Swiss-Prot record:
Gene Ontology cellular component terms for the protein in this record: cytoplasm
InterPro entries: Aldolase_TIM, TAL/FSA, Transaldolase_1, Transaldolase_AS
Subunit structure: Homodimer.
UniProt organism field: Prochlorococcus marinus (strain NATL2A)
EC number(s) stated in the UniProt entry for this protein: 2.2.1.2
Record key words, sorted: Cytoplasm, Pentose shunt, Schiff base, Transferase
Record-given protein name: Transaldolase
UniProt function note: Transaldolase is important for the balance of metabolites in the pentose-phosphate pathway.
Organism classification: Bacteria, Bacillati, Cyanobacteriota, Cyanophyceae, Synechococcales
Length: 332
């Protein structure tokens, strides 16, 4: 019998959720996703030190010798995310997701500006917009930024998505893809209820993605649904048939080593009709979010966590820049 991973790949686009190039080589996904935490983890591996140096050197050359170190580090942060993305694109046939600075999550204009800058860096290296997804947090401001960017042919992946109303707002904005989280929703419910576990069919994260998928397909939305943030392979198999699923190397390995029959659970051709289309303006969106304690808390936690990862990455880049430029100064 084929592995779960092989069977899943025949009904769902499998995406690698990692910045580790070796893991991507191993599992041959179509697409890959990164985020600040994953880039930070990869940047701390000795194997990728050369990519950090490349980002810093390119940024210094771009800004000139008179530029302040803080400005070089800021530029290098964008450069590093794109450098990793370009390396990943050498290994996959599809798209890479590169995230906008999470600290801009409540600033529409700054998010648009940053996204344009990121895509321009890819374009400068001959990479077309079709191979890049710009990841943006699913705040109202982020969704509005994505709406503008999509009209400029800059494709967006709306992340940190924890409830149905965030998904609806994204679909109405015409975004290319959403990443509804599964495991982080489960974490919240386990903590809130004191339950140790949920059967996969009752897992609140699985239930959330299933509802979003069926709503999109039954109402003709073109926005792709990519389940994300998994805690176990049971969550993944319960969403077999979803447009895409982005999966960590650890869980990809478990799927690859497990051999059992995998039935399709979500079917785009035969979606369950849940409810009619609804329209959300900013007021109704914010009311729906305010009424959902889990989504509000997890969105805030996610933005905070990614922002802290960016701060750490900037510190790492700053230390490395001082070391490199200190060594250069000593040789002159």
């Amino acid at each position: 019998m084929e592995s779960l991973l092989s069977q899943l790949s025949s009904m769902t686009v499998v995406v690698a959720d990692t910045g580790d190039l070796e893991a991507i080589k191993k599992y041959h996904p179509r697409d890959a996703t990164t985020n600040p935490s994953l880039i930070l983890a990869a940047a701390q591996m000795p194997a990728y030190q050369s990519l950090i140096d490349q980002a810093l050197t390119t940024s210094r050359e771009m800004l000139g010798t008179s530029a302040a170190k803080a400005d070089v580090v800021k530029e290098a942060l964008d450069e590093l995310c794109v450098v990793f993305g370009k390396e990943i694109l050498k290994l996959i046939p599809g798209r890479v997701s590169t995230e906008v600075d999470a600290r801009l999550s409540f600033d529409t204009d700054a998010t648009i500006e940053k996204a344009r800058k990121i895509i321009a860096k890819y374009n400068a290296d001959g990479i077309s917009n079709d191979r890049v997804l710009i990841k943006i947090a699913s705040t109202w401001e982020g969704i509005k930024a994505a709406e503008v960017l999509e009209k400029e042919n800059i494709h967006c992946n709306l992340t940190l998505l924890f409830n149905f109303y965030q998904a609806v707002a994204c679909a109405e904005a015409g975004v290319t893809l959403i990443s509804p989280f599964v495991g982080r929703i489960l974490d919240w419910y386990k903590s809130a209820t004191g339950r140790d576990s949920y059967p996969a069919t009752e897992d609140p994260g699985v239930v959330s993605v299933t509802k979003i998928f069926n709503f999109f397909k039954s109402n003709g939305y073109k926005t792709e649904v990519m389940g994300a943030s998994f805690r176990n392979i049971e969550e993944i198999t319960e969403l077999a048939g979803c447009d895409l699923l982005t999966i960590s190397p650890k869980l990809l390995q478990q799927l690859n080593e497990t051999h059992m029959d995998l039935p399709i659970k979500l079917n785009a051709q035969k979606p369950l009709v849940i409810e009619e289309k609804i329209h959300l303006d900013q007021t109704s969106f914010e009311l729906m979010m305010a009424g959902d304690k889990m989504a509000t808390e997890k969105l805030d936690d996610g933005i905070s966590g990614f922002s802290k990862a960016i701060d750490k990455l900037e510190n790492q880049l700053n230390e490395r820049l001082e070391l490199i430029e200190g060594e250069v100064a000593l040789t002159h």
